Amino acid sequence: KAAGQTTGLISSIEVSQGKNKTSVPTADLNPPWLAEQLTSMALAHCENAVIEVPSIALARRCLAGVELDVAILTNIRENHLDFHGSEANYQRAKLRLLDKLKPTGLAIINADDPKTHFLLNQIDRPVLTVGIKQEADITAKPIDCSAGEQTFVITAGSDSIPVRTTIIGDQHIYNCLAATAVGLAQGIEIETIAK
């Protein structure tokens, strides 16, 4: 918003075409439904679309026909093993996200997650790393955490900026780092991203 761009969202919590929001989970993500949502976003003049893609949707190839400008791998955990059958199948499903990148696409990888960190030498696209504990292109240093908010400093190169958020936890910090990486890749100033 602060950058003057309209962004559509498809997540496990909501779907929005910029301003119109509905509660629709992504568990049943399928190519026709996704095409309909992306068309609605285009008609609503969204310049960007953020799509949360669960491993089950990746295994079912629900991004068929979609090429991504940016793919973010925040972590690879042992989730949905009842569906995938094994950790290896789960990891293969998650890695399909990188296969959806355009030739000029950007991969954003969590340097703190050992199961995503090993990918760095295997990705044939530009990569930005994010992290709290390990060395990364974009880092966060937690400063304070209380019951109602947390504060941390995001550093990208020589630029640092404090961020305060009412959503608590490291996972949210990783999400903020990933969003910062996307914004910087689009040429948005870090001060604008922090808003």
Model-derived features with residue positions:
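Short beta->alpha connector loops
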Residues: P54-A57, D113-P114
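Conserved helix/coil segment N-terminal to the catalytic DExD/H
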Residues: I56-A64
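Conserved nucleotide-sensing/catalytic segment adjacent to the nucleotide-binding pocket
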Residues: S23-P54
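Acidic, Mg2+-coordinating active-site environments of NTP-dependent enzymes
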Residues: A44-E47, L68-K195
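Flexible beta-alpha connector loops of hexameric P-loop NTPases
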Residues: N20-P31, N79-A88
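Short beta-strand-centered segment that lines the nucleotide-binding/catalytic pocket of NTP-utilizing
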Residues: G4-N20, V53-P54
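Glycine-rich phosphate-binding P-loop
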Residues: K1
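Short hydrophobic/charged patches on amphipathic alpha-helices used for structural packing
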Residues: A35-T39, R60, L95
